Amino acid sequence: MILIKNGTIIDPSCKREEKGDLLIADGKIARIAPCGEIQEEGGEVIDATGMVVAPGLVDVHVHFRDPGFTYKEDIDTGAQAALQGGFTSVVLMANTKPVVDNEETLNYVLEKGKNTPIHVYSCASVSKGLQGKELVDMELLYSKGAAGFTDDGIPLLDVDILEQAFVKAASIGVPVSLHEENPALISNNGVNSDIAQKKFGIGGSPREAEIDLIARDLDIALKTGVILDVQHISTKEGVELVRQARQKSTRIHAEATPHHFSLTQEAV
């Protein structure tokens, strides 16, 4: 038996958030009660004061950089870091070297993930080599375990390719995740075209670059019925566009990075 005491117990599935004790017996949650109500009976006791007790967290957008860029991270170290942060399931992006656009590379990632203490899933790329010119074999890669499709970090500019990807993904019921920045509107990526641009005297990326592609792709997503994930959204206008689209379809989703929802350009 394991008794976890004095933690903040959070379970989004039932909207629970309260301080209390949690008893685990035979690998299952046996009881949740206010602090001090569960008596210690000889098992392991963990004092979780100041900590959160929650189901395993899921991160649908991670970079373990394996294969090809393991000087930054690899599947083993990434999984260990995820576990330390409470994440028990992760979805890897496909922008590795080689790109996860074929069965062999996808199998390498998934097999290596099986030897970690967490659940490791992986996306495949939407286009071959992340070039945005030719679709991967989505049906094959999905059948071999791809959790979704993304050219993360590179926007899909060819509308014909995008529509083909959406139609195919919708037919097999798998999500497509998109990096939304129109490069035609950007003079220097990674810096907002406002305070930071003026402060450092460099070009920047205007909010319109994100808004433009989000609006385009939401329209196509609603027409095709695809499950769409708008990646690392960073503007209030983008959020509002997603909110409006979700009123028409629950297949529309968005994600944000910690720095996008916790910092503004004034922090530069």
Model-predicted segments: where are they?
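Active-site metal-binding motif and surrounding structural segment of the metallo-beta-lactamase
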Residues: 37-53
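Acidic (Asp/Glu)-rich catalytic clusters
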Residues: 109-115, 138-143
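Metal-associated gating/positioning segment near the N- to mid-region
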Residues: 51-113
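Histidine/acidic residue-rich metal-binding segments in metalloenzymes
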Residues: 134-268
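Short, acidic/polar
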Residues: 71-79, 130-140, 216
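N-terminal metal-binding scaffold of metallo-dependent hydrolase/deaminase domains
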Residues: 1-40
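Divalent metal-coordination and catalytic microenvironments
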Residues: 7, 22, 27, 50, ...
